[in-house]
Design a protein with these regions (language model features):
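Acidic beta-strand-to-loop metal/phosphate-binding motif
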Residues: 242
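Residues at the C-termini of beta-strands that transition into short coil/loop
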Residues: 5, 29-32, 171, 209-211
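Interdomain motor-coupling "hinge/lid" segment immediately C-terminal to the ATP-binding subdomain
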Residues: 6-8, 12-111, 115
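Conserved nucleotide-sensing/catalytic segment adjacent to the nucleotide-binding pocket
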Residues: 1-2
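Accessory nucleic acid-recognition modules appended to NTPase machines
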Residues: 66, 70-239
């Protein structure tokens, strides 16, 4: 028996509880770039350009025109993902959720936290949304497989740092569609793609931080923090990726 769904909380709380010990949970990801190229009718150069913009949802690969792909991804995000979250959680101020998605989509690959997002709402959106509401909405987006987070890990101290952290989209095509395909920054999107690739291979993925102490121009001790793009862990395996 296969039970599918688009909400992790529903699956984990209801289905897994019902079949405890008698079933497995399988996270089905969008196509990786390698899988995409097995279907794409073209060379790797053009395939990469296509993948960066439209992502790896299987149906997009079969579509022949850009207009079809744009319309499909835009409708999917608005009419399936957002509506499902709004209806499931009875969100009255849906515009706040949409604004949050826009903020997160514009900041992939950038360190952020709830206070920063709250400040952005106040200064850019002119909204007094609370930090607790932002945290709740982020949790809803994670449960719906829209975004995932990468926590910061202090390599020398061997401990996790609470915030800031990074958020990545489950599919870059959906991220781009949400922004009207206006912010196609290849370096940031590539970072998102690498993160998704590692997770699809079973790795847990963190953002690495190395604390460095030295003397400043005044001879005083100063802390600086160097970032490692990703620390990928799988059992006894650990990889540092820059």
């Amino acid at each position: 028996v296969y039970v599918t769904g688009s909400n992790s909380k529903f699956l984990s709380k209801d289905v897994i509880t019902e079949f405890r010990g008698r079933g497995d949970e399988i996270h089905v990801y969008p196509l990786t770039f390698k899988e995409f190229m097995q279907v794409y009718e073209g060379d790797m150069y053009h395939g990469w350009a296509e993948y960066v913009v439209y992502g790896g949802l299987p149906l997009t690969v079969t579509m022949k025109t850009e207009e079809q792909k744009i319309n499909y991804l835009t409708r999917l995000f608005e009419e399936t993902y957002l509506k499902d979250i709004i209806e499931r959680h009875h969100i009255e101020k849906s515009q706040e959720l949409e604004d949050l998605v826009n903020i997160l989509a514009s900041a992939i690959g950038s360190l952020t936290n709830v206070p920063k997002i709250e400040a952005t709402f106040r200064s850019v959106v002119q909204s007094n949304i609370s930090g607790n509401t932002i945290r709740q909405y982020i949790e809803y987006l994670e449960d719906a497989f829209v975004i995932n987070k990468a926590n910061r890990y202090n390599v020398k101290g061997r401990k996790y740092i609470g915030t800031p952290l990074k958020y990545y989209f489950e599919d870059v095509g959906l991220r781009n569609a949400r922004l009207g395909f206006r912010q196609i920054e290849e370096t940031h999107i590539m970072e998102n793609i690498v993160y998704n690739e590692l997770r699809s291979r079973g790795y847990s993925v963190d953002v690495g931080v190395v604390e460095k102490r030295g003397l400043n121009s005044e001879g005083k001790t100063e802390r600086t923090y160097l970032e490692i793009d990703f620390i990928a862990n799988l059992g006894s395996k650990r990889y540092y990726i820059q």
